[in-house]
Amino acid sequence: MFTGLCAFPLTPLHQQHLDEKAFIRILSRLTDTGVDSLGILGSTGSYAYLNREQRKRVVQVAKAHVGSIPMMVGVGAIATSEVLRLVEDAQQAGADALLLPMMSYQPLSAEEIFAFYEEVCRHVSVPVCLYDNPRTTHVTLADELQGRIAALPAIASIKIPGLPEPQASERVATLRRHLPARVTLGASGDALATAGLQAGCQVWY
């Protein structure tokens, strides 16, 4: 599922609850266009502002309406224990993959970041996409560290920030040297998707 177009829907809310009818309409518009996969509860889906029960319901509704289209679910949280609970919820609801950013209140060392991904990957039964999003998380992952994380068997893809050319080609080529061949790269951001794909990314996230 880590190739092609992975569409990330908004999560519409009404009075602090998921607006299920509006959400289903959004999902239907995406599935009707023939996207390759869906990214539920990404940054576009406002995952950081939803509690566990809200997230669980979002995933349940999505799974019931996406048919055979693969579904990746964001499980980002500050506490590792909460991430593991979200992982369990997403997998039980039928997630086909997990989107995992590094979120932290305190600055972390490279070893601490690696240990986090290693621990989470011990508890997954589906592939994981490493979410490199320093602008939002304020956590910068060095290329060497991303390479170490990507070597974990559960890691299948990396979502990186989009860049314009020629920076996109330079970024993809540099990062690719640190990654196993089986791990795909995907660019995020609508405006920069073309540059990312032309630079060698296999996915438009």
Where are the model-predicted features located?
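Catalytic alpha/beta core domains of metabolic enzymes, predominantly
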Residues: 122, 134-205
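Active-site beta->alpha loop and helix N-cap motifs at the rims of alpha/beta catalytic domains
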Residues: 1-140, 148
